[in-house]
Amino acid sequence: MSPVVKGASAAAAATGIVAACAVVLLGASGEQPVHPFPTVGVLMAGGEHWCTASVVDSPRGNVVATAAHCVAPAGEDGVPGEVAHDGLAIGELSFAPAFSGEGSGTQPLGVWKVRSVHVDERWTKWGDETADFAFLTIEPDEDGRSVQEAVGRGEAPAPDWTSGYEREVTVIGYPESEHNPQNKPVSCTTQSRHDLDDPDMLYINCSGFWTGTSGSPWIADRGGTGQPGRLIGVLSGGETDVDSTAALYDEKAKALYERAAKG
């Protein structure tokens, strides 16, 4: 059964569903802006932005994680779905970490071109929600920097392929502007568990995770500076803003990540 998505499903993306953005906090006069979640941002194409995505630690610093339904249509009965958003062409898709501000917003850490998208065929052929995750290979900027260097290499969580379901997790997402006119990030630290409706999925109960938060990272063991934690999955869906689910990373997710990391 396909999830009730909170980001850009193919149909939602076609209508320009907008994901909200990470707020930028200004320090005292003369100080540099502080980005509370520099690794997390939004996907962009054709001047629109939707869904949440985040930098995950990788050898080359070039990998971003999001939900599969944000970048690829769900298949059914072995037949791939139809792409409903022209911007999903690889040449146009990009990632803006720490995206912020009202309206069209700003991109304080730049806009990074997506080189390739890596999605499990369980999603593209069958719409299997337990495979609703994707990894994106990001091109370096004109100076040769990786996206991970731009957001801070010590800030990105490492992936965890063998996590259990019951973890203390921090989830960070960007609700659409209808529910978040100031475009401030929503975050929640709570206990994850099996979803009662689908025990193969992770579940949390936290308010404020409206449409636009699909792809939000679920980070276990997140601490202070130098303790970015472990990424165990990304937000997939949920019936309400209070109920959120995620597909737990597995060995197939690891294979996708490794493919993305090779560039």
For the regions a language model picked out, list residue spans one by one.
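Solvent-exposed loop/turn segments at secondary-structure junctions
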Residues: 48-50, 60-61, 70-73, 101-103, ...
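Conserved catalytic-core segment of clan PA serine endopeptidases
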Residues: 30-38, 49, 81-144
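Structural recognition of the beta-strand scaffold that forms the well-ordered cores
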Residues: 42, 63-65, 94-96, 134-137, ...
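Secretory targeting and sorting signals
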Residues: 1-28
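Chymotrypsin/trypsin-fold serine protease catalytic domain
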Residues: 129-205
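Catalytic histidine site
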Residues: 31, 35-100, 191-197, 206-207
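Catalytic nucleophile loop of clan PA
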Residues: 208-234
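C-terminal cap/linker of serine protease catalytic domains
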Residues: 232, 238-263
